[in-house]
A protein has these predicted regions:
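A short helix-loop-beta-strand connector motif used in the catalytic cores of GNAT acetyltransferases and
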Residues: 43-64, 123, 127
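Conserved GNAT-fold acetyl-CoA-binding loop/helix
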Residues: 26-49
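Residue-level recognition of the GNAT/N-acetyltransferase active site
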Residues: 134, 168
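Conserved active-site alpha-helix within GNAT-family acetyltransferase domains
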Residues: 157-158, 169-175
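Conserved acyl-donor/pantetheine-binding loop and adjacent beta-alpha core of acyl/acetyltransferases
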Residues: 71-131
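Conserved acetyl-CoA-binding loop-helix of GNAT-fold acetyltransferases
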Residues: 133, 139-153
Length: 175
């Protein structure tokens, strides 16, 4: 397995890995009923991931894991607060074709509040916003290996000592 920072020319590929991995994730699926056309949920998830991946790549905080030359996992890390302006500058306006601006901002605020709870309850240098593994490789140890051999060394290389994360899936806890 090879680990490295993602490149801007890989936004679509990395976003697809994230979208495939998180399509049924509760944080995302709860927004489906708020879409203008709920049947466009998959397209919305992909567009949202493109925004997040593009922003993370520009901040040098998107890592990928490659197996046999294919990206099979991605990690989006956060070291600083991301403003709504950052999202808008990285394509969030594209999301308005799927959801009203009010509902999208409510969703972003919900996610931000969840992250704020983590900030208030623990100290950490980096926040693992997302660890996505393509469905074929899920629950085969790829995510754990990526954390140990890719994400941890990256955090240490920046002078970081701790990593915070949130999950609402029991099977994600023991890595």
């Amino acid at each position: 397995m090879q680990y490295r920072k993602a490149r801007l020319d890989e936004v679509q590929e990395v976003a697809q890995v994230c979208a495939d991995a998180f399509e049924d994730y509760p944080y995302l699926s709860m927004i489906a009923s708020n879409l203008k056309n709920p049947e466009q949920y998959k397209e919305f998830v992909l567009a949202l991931q493109e925004v997040l991946v593009r922003l993370a790549i520009k901040q040098d905080s998107c890592l990928v894991a490659e197996k046999d030359g294919r990206i099979v996992a991605a990690a989006i890390l956060q070291h600083q607060t991301i403003s709504m302006l950052n999202y808008l500058q990285n394509g969030a306006t594209k999301l308005f074709s799927f959801i009203s601006i009010t509902k999208l901002f409510k969703y972003f605020n919900f996610v931000e509040e969840s992250e704020r709870h983590l900030e208030d309850s623990a100290e950490y240098d980096w926040y693992l916003m997302m660890l996505a593994v393509t469905p074929y490789y899920q629950r085969k140890g790829i995510g754990s290996l990526f954390l140990l051999e890719g994400v941890e060394p990256f955090v240490r290389s920046t002078g970081g000592h701790s990593l915070g994360l949130i999950t609402n899936r029991d099977y994600n806890v023991p890595f």
